[in-house]
UniProtKB/Swiss-Prot annotation:
<dbReference type="InterPro" id="IPR016140">
    <property type="entry name" value="Bifunc_inhib/LTP/seed_store"/>
</dbReference>
<feature type="disulfide bond">
    <location>
        <begin position="27"/>
        <end position="74"/>
    </location>
</feature>
<feature type="disulfide bond">
    <location>
        <begin position="52"/>
        <end position="97"/>
    </location>
</feature>
<keyword id="KW-0813">Transport</keyword>
<dbReference type="GO" id="GO:0009414">
    <property type="term" value="P:response to water deprivation"/>
</dbReference>
<dbReference type="InterPro" id="IPR036312">
    <property type="entry name" value="Bifun_inhib/LTP/seed_sf"/>
</dbReference>
<feature type="signal peptide">
    <location>
        <begin position="1"/>
        <end position="23"/>
    </location>
</feature>
<dbReference type="GO" id="GO:0006869">
    <property type="term" value="P:lipid transport"/>
</dbReference>
<feature type="disulfide bond">
    <location>
        <begin position="37"/>
        <end position="51"/>
    </location>
</feature>
<keyword id="KW-0732">Signal</keyword>
<dbReference type="InterPro" id="IPR000528">
    <property type="entry name" value="Plant_nsLTP"/>
</dbReference>
<feature type="disulfide bond">
    <location>
        <begin position="72"/>
        <end position="111"/>
    </location>
</feature>
<comment type="function">
    <text>Plant non-specific lipid-transfer proteins transfer phospholipids as well as galactolipids across membranes. May play a role in wax or cutin deposition in the cell walls of expanding epidermal cells and certain secretory tissues.</text>
</comment>
<keyword id="KW-1015">Disulfide bond</keyword>
<dbReference type="GO" id="GO:0009737">
    <property type="term" value="P:response to abscisic acid"/>
</dbReference>
<dbReference type="GO" id="GO:0048046">
    <property type="term" value="C:apoplast"/>
</dbReference>
<keyword id="KW-0446">Lipid-binding</keyword>
Amino acid sequence: MAFALRFFTCLVLTVCIVASVDAAISCGTVAGSLAPCATYLSKGGLVPPSCCAGVKTLNSMAKTTPDRQQACRCIQSTAKSISGLNPSLASGLPGKCGVSIPYPISMSTNCNNIK
């Protein structure tokens, strides 16, 4: 009986771990959410409400460590496609949208270290 309980516990933990790894956010979702931010990130001015909506959506989706790490990688990848991106505007964007994230928005952020 004890063996069966341990086996069941290990099985449940394995399913939970696999489910969280598979839950990573896609880069397409990140790029789509941040698309309304492109002009602001390169030219400044007022942050469009649709940009902040995307930032807030991404923040609410990135609940697990794999999700946050994937979101970080996708943000870095998406940032490379924004012509004339201003790194200062990018790093300050979450705060401008009233969002607190547990890592800096920067091309030098090591996404593997994000928890």
